């Protein structure tokens, strides 16, 4: 099945599970995820573990890690559980064709078996340093060959490093659309991160990306957005003025999906520290926040969770 048809099915699944009545409220003290709830100790390792995000049904936890057993660099791994109240099992490597010898990270599961992710593999036709790809699992649970989204100016991928894709389908709401949020940045040459959005065009492919100006601070590095399922709250990583450490998690909201976002505010010291908090992601109901913290007490980056 082609990319667009799969995304369409994913959109129906997400739209059917949209959140109602959740507001941006205070978070509890964040905890290292493998130390609570009977979760498997291997969710975090002495390696780099980050980019955590749940599947819409809450039964799979996707992460990026450079732990032993991967294909090279950062790989995408997934832990599963039998119910939303059960502990997470040990993460398993997704293998090829998703993972490669290059960095493969920022997984974003959608619907029933769809997955956006970033790859820095230098394949023919690559747009830039890290591009957004989409893949899906077939009925046998096998991942299809990933498809790269179009290069700029026709599509969202650019010569820079795209990160943190976040798929939002609010097309059933007034002024609602099907959108893919993400960030662009570069370490060398140094280009500070900015948040962008690309609209899926009339059932066709994702179109040109535009900067979400109200979420961006020209003097800061704003990266890795994640939008709540109802499209009314977004979390992101930033080092803007007011940050407690190298990177903090910030949040913005809006009353309606067609409105501009509010000015981002720091989520506070229950979550943010003097370390770097990155790639935040909200659960489907908006009641849980996952993120990476670097350095962690165990590895160069560890996965944390908080609730509200």
Model-flagged regions — what are they?
Residues 5-16:
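Bacterial N-terminal signal peptides
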